[in-house]
Amino acid sequence: MRRLASLAVALPLLAVVASPALAQDMSPRQSAEAFGVPAVSSSWVNQDGSTMTLVFGAGNSVSGFYVNNAPGFGCQGTPYPLVGLTWGNFIGFTVAWDNATANCNSVTSWTGFAEAAGSDVTIVTDWNLAYQGSSSGEIQQGSDTFTLVNKAMKETPKM
């Protein structure tokens, strides 16, 4: 598997991964701590300048907003709802590209893991974008690395 060796990260992350039963029953605070962030909103940016706000919720749930700024893609510059799940330092989240501003008739899902290196925390992901092609549904694939920008936002973006 890609980057399997990188799973050996900070001790708090290893403790959660080593015990799936613990990860399954984690509180929002414990889930957030596995990602190296407090149990409030956190802001992330990827290599293309897209941003997301993650809010760790009940159980293993995560929600928030995603703002696409990737060159060559539509639905840019406005927040779209994000929903997902965490398992220890692993994460999966999805954005349906439809809000009051624009509907791109597509859905993107990311899966990945958080890792810490010194004071930096990143989420390394692969994504699948499902959209309507010229004659049928198509899937485009890629990868993103998100870097933690700030550990505690006082408010989330307005929809």
From Swiss-Prot:
GO molecular function: biotin binding
GO cellular component: extracellular region
Keyword Metal-binding: no
PROSITE patterns in the record: AVIDIN_2
Places the protein is found: Secreted
Signal sequence residues: 1-23
Chain sites annotated for binding biotin: N46, S50, Y66, N68, G74, S106, T108, D144
Protein family according to the UniProt entry: Belongs to the avidin/streptavidin family.
Role played: The exact role played by afifavidin is still obscure. Forms a strong non-covalent complex with biotin and 2-iminobiotin.
Domain characteristics, as noted in the entry: The C-terminal segment plays a key role in the formation and stabilization of the octameric configuration, since the short afifavidin (lacking the last 5 amino acids) is only dimeric. The X-ray structure of intact afifavidin shows that the C-terminal segments stretch into the biotin-binding sites of adjacent non-canonical monomers.
Protein name: Afifavidin
